[in-house]
Amino acid sequence: MLLSRTAVAVARRATAAPALRRSIATTVVRCNAETKPVPHIKRLSEIKTKDDLFGPGAAPGTVPTDLEQATGLERLEILGKMEGVDVFDMKPLDASRRGTMENPISVRSAGDEQYAGCTGFPADSHNVIWLTMTRERPVERCPECGNVYKMDYVGPQDDHAHDHGHDHHGFEEPKTFADYVKPEYW
C-alpha cells in the first residue's frame, strides 16, 4: 500500500518530455533555405604573394571560422593542413646517427637563419643546446656531444636586381674558435 502511494506521487511530480525537440515547421524552413555560395578559397598551390594570404572574412553579424579569419603564416598553415602538407616541416631531426663533418645532419630552412636544438647522441643524452646556422655559416657543431648540423637553404634565391643595400645593417658575426682553425684540420 505504502509503495503504490509513493509511485503515484513520483509519477505526478515527473515532467513529461516533449516528443519533438523542435517543431517541424522550423525544420522545413531550414531545409528550404537557400544556401549562399562559399567564396573561393585559394589552394596552397595558388598562393604566390603575401596578398594571397588574406581570407574573405566573415559575413556581417556572424562569427568567423579560423579559415575565414586567419591571415599570413597562420592562414598558410591552415591551407597546408587542409591539403595534408606540413608547411613548417615539424618532424624531429634525424637522431638515429651522429652527425659528422663528412656526413652532417641536414636541417632544411627557408630563411636566412635557422635554430636547431641538439639533445645529444644517443638522443636525450644531454639538455637541449640551441645552435644557430646561417646562410653564410651553414655548419654548426654541438659543443657538448660533437654532433654536426648543416643548414640546407630551400627558400627563394636572392634577387639583387633591385637591391641597393638599404637592408644592410653592418652587423658582422662574431668570430669563434672555428674561424682560427687551419683548413687542413677540418
UniProtKB/Swiss-Prot annotation:
Zn(2+) binds at C118, H126, C142, C145. Component of the cytochrome c oxidase, the last enzyme in the mitochondrial electron transport chain which drives oxidative phosphorylation. The respiratory chain contains 3 multisubunit complexes succinate dehydrogenase (complex II, CII), ubiquinol-cytochrome c oxidoreductase (cytochrome b-c1 complex, complex III, CIII) and cytochrome c oxidase (complex IV, CIV), that cooperate to transfer electrons derived from NADH and succinate to molecular oxygen, creating an electrochemical gradient over the inner membrane that drives transmembrane transport and the ATP synthase. GO terms for biological process: mitochondrial cytochrome c oxidase assembly; mitochondrial electron transport, cytochrome c to oxygen. Its main location: mitochondrion. It is found in: Mitochondrion inner membrane. Coiled coil: none annotated. Component of the cytochrome c oxidase (complex IV, CIV), a multisubunit enzyme composed of 11 subunits. The complex is composed of a catalytic core of 3 subunits Cox1, Cox2 and Cox3, encoded in the mitochondrial DNA, and 8 supernumerary subunits Cox4, Cox5a/Cox5, Cox6, Cox7, Cox8, Cox7a/Cox9, Cox6b/Cox12 and Cox6a/Cox13, which are encoded in the nuclear genome. CDD domains: Cyt_c_Oxidase_Vb (cd00924). Keywords: Membrane, Metal-binding, Mitochondrion, Mitochondrion inner membrane, Transit peptide, Zinc. It comes from the Eukaryota. It comes from Neurospora crassa (strain ATCC 24698 / 74-OR23-1A / CBS 708.71 / DSM 1257 / FGSC 987). It is a peripheral membrane protein. Residues 1-31 form a transit peptide. This is Cytochrome c oxidase subunit 4, mitochondrial. InterPro entries: Cyt_c_oxidase_su5b, Cyt_c_oxidase_su5b_sf. Pfam families: COX5B. Pathway: Energy metabolism; oxidative phosphorylation. One of its GO terms (molecular function) is zinc ion binding. Transmembrane segments: none annotated. One of its GO terms (cellular component) is mitochondrial inner membrane. Belongs to the cytochrome c oxidase subunit 5B family.
